[in-house]
Amino acid sequence: MDYKKIHIPVMVKEVIQLLNPYGGIYVDATLGCGGHSLAILKRLSPDGRLIGIDRDESAIFYANRILDDSRVILRKASFSHLKEVLSELNIEKIDGIIFDLGVSMLQLKDFERGFSFHSEERLDMRMDQTEPLTAWDVVNKYPEQKLTQIFRDYGDEPFARRIAREIIRQRGKKTIDTCKELADLVKKTVPRHGRLHPATQIFQAIRIEVNREFEELRQGLLQAVELLNSGGRICVISYHSGEDRVVKNFFREEEQKGNLRILTKKPLLPSLEEVAKNPSARSARLRGGEKI
């Protein structure tokens, strides 16, 4: 797979303006293919350091191709292990950190990973392939009530109960094995509005459940603020209301505690020019804060 053809980092200019990297230690907590890391490196001083972290082994592999620099260290880990990873590197404090949330294009374009509507591969959606829970388990083993709750809480899906009932009915005949089977089931069950595929929010909800994304995000944000030096900055890009709500509430709580100064009273949005070049950026929301 040629990552250069599929990966366009989102809101790079705005992230760099907020982080304002130069000297010190910076962390890209969602390495992906290394787009944001590369932009940070271009601004980083010769004695600066950049730590790239991702729970996806393939992200580490691809990022290694473009981040061949003595200032860079890459590690496979989830948000909740942020402090542990840095401790192993004898790093107690950092000067900036970026979180670019959600699924990466690298994962979406790899049909074998089971993230795409069109994939004929088995339902998977694990960002970390060593984790036991898969999308297949959620779809074929969870009871109706739990499916409904996940679809509502993580996907803001108005037809959550109807879709959950149809999944239960269908799997009574045969297991739902592939992403395409699930996408087709949802498409037949609910009306389509606009250009968005009707299964978009369902896939999002299942992915969040499989990867414990909200729990990991809260842990990552907590550890990040603890690790920041005074004046250090945190940037978070989210792509749907649930993620953004977690980030917004966390920033407010930390501001009330006197730990953080919010730099973005309202989230920054991608420019019309960026969205035209990279449609996947259209739902991005960027929030930033500075450690007090």
Swiss-Prot record:
It comes from the Bacteria. The keyword Protein transport does not apply. The keyword Transferase applies. Pfam families: Methyltransf_5. One of its GO terms (molecular function) is rRNA (cytosine-N4-)-methyltransferase activity. One of its GO terms (cellular component) is cytoplasm. It catalyses: cytidine(1402) in 16S rRNA + S-adenosyl-L-methionine = N(4)-methylcytidine(1402) in 16S rRNA + S-adenosyl-L-homocysteine + H(+). GO terms for biological process: rRNA base methylation. It is found in: Cytoplasm. S-adenosyl-L-methionine binds at residues 34-36, 54, 81, 100, 107. Its EC number is 2.1.1.199. InterPro entries: RsmH, SAM-dep_MeTrfase_MraW_recog, SAM-dependent_MTases_sf. Keywords: Cytoplasm, Methyltransferase, rRNA processing, S-adenosyl-L-methionine, Transferase. Its main location: cytoplasm. Specifically methylates the N4 position of cytidine in position 1402 (C1402) of 16S rRNA. Belongs to the methyltransferase superfamily. RsmH family. This is Ribosomal RNA small subunit methyltransferase H. It comes from Thermodesulfovibrio yellowstonii (strain ATCC 51303 / DSM 11347 / YP87). The lineage of its organism: Bacteria, Pseudomonadati, Nitrospirota, Thermodesulfovibrionia, Thermodesulfovibrionales.
